[in-house]
């Protein structure tokens, strides 16, 4: 079974949402006076004043803060508004889109399966995702430069004047591993941060705008060259999306189902999900750009 890609884009934008109250991460923590745990009430007040000033100056529309020390909450404040247009004040139980901070959650799911002995980190990903068994590397990389094999471990660059290399591919020095996925060194890209030949192909295939399942996504991805040899360069990429498919393949269930049953429910994370239920939409905080314009939708 597989999860629709448009739902699991928790790695890029709108999807995984989490309440900012303590019980979003388990049972509510006890409170304590700051001085009881070695913190300054006066300095915490400075934080509150600074955040309210940021709202007044238009640096942000709203937010909330929570600080715990030694297992006790010593600071819990709200600032500004959750919806400026509706004049709704920020509340401690507002729900927020966490965007790429969902990446650590995905990696936790992967490492849970690793701890159960379901795979080794140095296993090639194709062992579990056969759609990625025949990956090749593009000879054209950044801004017209090309790559060529120089030895058994690295790749070198040739000048952009070598037109004969444009659009060609070759076998990778080795296949990407699960460890590579977790480290963003598997050779994949995202498609919208650069203008390489591989980035252009991601965009042409509309790889990140698809409603496909994760299984369909990796099938499509397997037809596009890697941008770099695995293990040779760090590059922010779709590696975490592939991790989601790895979880599905190893666990035998949809990625969202795995997170819900193995992670969110055991931790009592009642307000964490891929989609905000209708009865919680009024708690969803709006998003604003640095220029102050509202972005996204519920």
Roles of regions detected by a PLM:
Residues 1-7:
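N-terminal secretory signal peptides that target proteins for export/translocation
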């Amino acid at each position: 079974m597989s999860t629709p890609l448009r739902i699991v884009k928790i790695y890029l934008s709108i999807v995984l949402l989490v309440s900012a109250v303590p019980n979003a991460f388990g049972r509510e923590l006890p409170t304590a006076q700051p001085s009881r745990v070695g913190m300054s009430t006066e300095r915490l007040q400075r934080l509150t004043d600074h955040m309210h000033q940021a709202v007044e100056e238009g640096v942000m529309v709203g937010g909330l803060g929570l600080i715990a020390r030694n297992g006790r909450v010593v600071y819990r404040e709200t600032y500004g508004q959750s919806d400026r247009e509706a004049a709704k004040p920020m509340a401690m139980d507002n729900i927020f889109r966490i965007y790429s901070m969902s990446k650590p959650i995905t990696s936790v799911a992967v490492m849970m399966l690793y701890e159960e002995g379901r795979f080794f980190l140095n296993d090639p990903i194709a062992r579990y995702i056969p759609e990625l068994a025949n990956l090749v590397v593009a000879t054209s990389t950044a801004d017209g430069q090309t790559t060529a094999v120089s030895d058994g471990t690295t790749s070198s660059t040739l000048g952009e004047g070598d037109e004969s290399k444009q659009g060609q591919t070759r076998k990778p020095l080795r296949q990407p591993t699960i460890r590579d996925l977790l480290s963003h060194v598997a050779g994949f890209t995202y498609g919208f941060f650069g203008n390489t030949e591989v980035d252009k192909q991601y965009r042409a295939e509309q790889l990140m705008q698809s409603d496909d399942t994760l299984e369909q996504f990796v099938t499509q991805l397997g037809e596009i060259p890697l941008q770099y040899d695995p293990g040779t360069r760090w590059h922010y990429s779709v590696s975490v999306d592939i991790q989601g498919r790895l979880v599905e393949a190893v666990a035998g269930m949809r990625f969202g189902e795995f997170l819900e049953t193995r992670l969110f429910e055991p931790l009592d994370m009642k307000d964490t999900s891929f989609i905000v239920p209708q009865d919680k939409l009024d708690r969803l905080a709006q998003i604003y750009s640095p220029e102050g314009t509202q972005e996204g939708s519920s």
